[in-house]
Amino acid sequence: MPRRRRIEPRKILPDPKFGSELLAKFINVLMVDGKKSIAESIVYNALETLAQRTGKDALESFEIALENVRPTVEVKSRRVGGSTYQVPVEVRPTRRNALGMRWIVEAARKRGDKSMALRLANELSDAVDNKGAAVKKREDVHRMAEANKAFAHFRW
């Protein structure tokens, strides 16, 4: 943590095809070993498949899927008097996006389809319909926060 001034977050360049910063960030989350062109082709193929399946705009469908996966509350461990409590806290908007993207990518990697583009397309399609592993992860996090609502006064 800086002592003097707040550090400005780095500006991310929008992706070349759709011109979306959110999609560029998602491509970066999916990227492995710095192979961005491969990550881009996977994402664009997945979005193309998703657009054909839903009949809607690919970017719009992606944003709906991400919206359905984003968590609003999460739990953080807080140690008070020798015991650890899971304290529910609201998630900051940047972290909300980051978690949603990470969960979609993790869920897609765990699927058993042929190619990563197909796995990602299926996971995004499920997320648009409010089902799938990524949405389940969000529900679990929300349930955990709801169960620990009694400890909300330990917030810092």
Swiss-Prot record:
One Pfam family this chain carries? Ribosomal_S7
Q: Name one GO cellular component term.
A: small ribosomal subunit
Q: Name one GO molecular function term.
A: tRNA binding
Please give the biological process terms from Gene Ontology that the record holds: translation
Keywords from the named record: Ribonucleoprotein, Ribosomal protein, RNA-binding, rRNA-binding, tRNA-binding
Per the record, the domain of life is Bacteria
By its UniProt entry, which Gene3D superfamilies does this protein fall under?
Answer: Ribosomal protein S7 domain (1.10.455.10)
> Per its UniProt record, what PROSITE patterns does this chain match?
RIBOSOMAL_S7
Q: Subunit arrangement?
A: Part of the 30S ribosomal subunit. Contacts proteins S9 and S11.
Task: Tell me the NCBIfam families matching this sequence.
Answer: rpsG_bact
UniProt lists the family membership as follows: Belongs to the universal ribosomal protein uS7 family.
State the function annotated in the UniProt record: One of the primary rRNA binding proteins, it binds directly to 16S rRNA where it nucleates assembly of the head domain of the 30S subunit. Is located at the subunit interface close to the decoding center, probably blocks exit of the E-site tRNA.
Protein known as: Small ribosomal subunit protein uS7
